[in-house]
């Protein structure tokens, strides 16, 4: 079968590999669509992992939708022909962190994956992913392309659930890429009175306006002052950081007012520290929080929003490319110019 091998952001190759063989409690999925996530192009993170594992390349890809083509003899809940989304990470539900509601901090979740990765024609789904409810049979009303968004939208659902984004709030979203525009849509659904977004990219700014932001600001301006001018002299209730730029992290701190919640949905690279005016935050009861990944409850929410057609994900797809043009796709995502979501698919699908 064909797989996409990642050596670094500028060296992504289509190559041959063995088709995975499944065991009795596993399933084999033929990939139809696979999205490139922003985390796939976090080069420092990927190279560190490769060094730790002692391997020259990785087969990435975790936003997949496809069809079950083989089922192990002991699998009872799924059948050949099912159209599915598969979660690459699953929590155990039993550990201390899971019981406390921190499923994405679960050790099992951080160590589960499918084989080899979503940028392959076929992926083997291990028994644990099946047992822990990581396989979702998709309704006929959800396309493969929509299925690709269950995981990234699930991450967004988790962040806003933890921050309790709710009716009447002003929400500031720093970064108007794919995750920022998903946050924009969900915040409006959850009842936010005003959603303000920022970016430095003209295309992203245009898209944020198209998706209904009440205000779209250039990130290289004094956004805290502008927000006060358009928000009755108040700073945002919720601030969601959707870019790893250090400047955005600093802006998030600067834009926090009385009662604000600052959610780091994305963070700068390792070793970066941000100064916190802790005395001001103490007297104003500012909350700083992080959100990582998606738990099953969040994936369920994402699935239901997509099923109800409340979240527009199709218009976030700017490029549909065959596996053979994976390098072009990685360039588009890493450079983040006139693009949003890039979806890859096996060449035979493109040819048909």
Model regions: which residues?
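C-terminal hydrophobic helical "lid"/dimerization subdomain
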Residues: 250-254, 296-352
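Glycine-rich beta-strand-centered segment in the early N-terminal region that forms part
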Residues: 20-34, 48-99, 136-139
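Glycine-rich cofactor phosphate-binding loops and adjacent beta1-alpha1 units
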Residues: 163, 206, 211-285, 327, ...
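Mid-domain Rossmann-like dinucleotide-binding core that forms the NAD(H)/NADP(H) cofactor-binding site
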Residues: 140-221
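Short glycine-centered segments of the SAM/dcSAM-binding site in methyltransferase folds
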Residues: 83, 170, 260-261, 287
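Short Gly/Pro-enriched turn/cap motifs at secondary-structure boundaries
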Residues: 7, 18-19, 55-61, 111-117, ...
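NAD(P)H dinucleotide-binding glycine-rich loop of Rossmann-like/cofactor-binding domains
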Residues: 92-174
């Amino acid at each position: 079968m064909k797989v996409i091998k990642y050596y670094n952001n500028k060296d992504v190759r289509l190559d041959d590999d063995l088709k995975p063989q499944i065991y009795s409690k596993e399933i084999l999925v033929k990939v139809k669509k696979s999205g490139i996530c922003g985390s796939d192009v976090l080069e420092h993170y990927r190279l560190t992992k490769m060094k730790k594992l002692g391997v020259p390349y990785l087969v990435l890809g975790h936003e997949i939708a496809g069809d079950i083509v083989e089922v192990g003899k002991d699998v009872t809940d799924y059948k050949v022909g099912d159209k599915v989304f598969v979660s690459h990470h699953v929590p155990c539900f039993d550990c201390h962190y899971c019981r406390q509601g921190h499923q994405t901090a679960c050790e099992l979740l951080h160590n589960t994956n499918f084989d080899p990765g979503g940028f392959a024609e076929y992926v083997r789904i291990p028994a644990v992913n099946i047992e822990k409810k990581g396989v979702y049979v998709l309704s006929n009303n959800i396309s493969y392309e929509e299925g690709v968004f269950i995981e990234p939208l699930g991450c967004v659902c988790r962040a806003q659930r933890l921050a309790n984004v709710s009716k009447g709030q002003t929400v500031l979203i720093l970064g108007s890429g794919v995750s920022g525009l998903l946050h924009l849509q969900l915040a409006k659904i959850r009842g936010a009175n005003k959603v303000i977004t920022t970016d430095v990219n003209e295309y992203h700014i245009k898209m944020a306006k198209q998706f209904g932001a009440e205000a779209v600001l250039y990130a290289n301006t004094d956004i805290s002052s502008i927000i006060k001018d358009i928000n009755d002299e108040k700073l945002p209730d919720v601030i969601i950081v959707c870019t790893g730029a250090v400047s955005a992290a600093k802006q998030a701190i600067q834009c926090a007012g009385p009662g604000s919640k600052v959610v780091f949905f994305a963070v700068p690279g390792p070793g970066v520290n941000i100064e916190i005016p802790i005395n001001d935050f103490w007297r104003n009861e500012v909350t700083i929080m992080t959100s990582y990944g998606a738990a099953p409850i969040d994936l369920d929410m994402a699935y239901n929003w997509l099923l109800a057609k409340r979240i527009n994900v199709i218009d976030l797809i700017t490029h549909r490319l065959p596996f053979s043009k994976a390098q072009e796709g990685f360039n588009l995502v890493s450079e983040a110019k006139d693009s949003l979501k890039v979806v890859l698919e096996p060449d035979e699908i493109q040819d048909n």
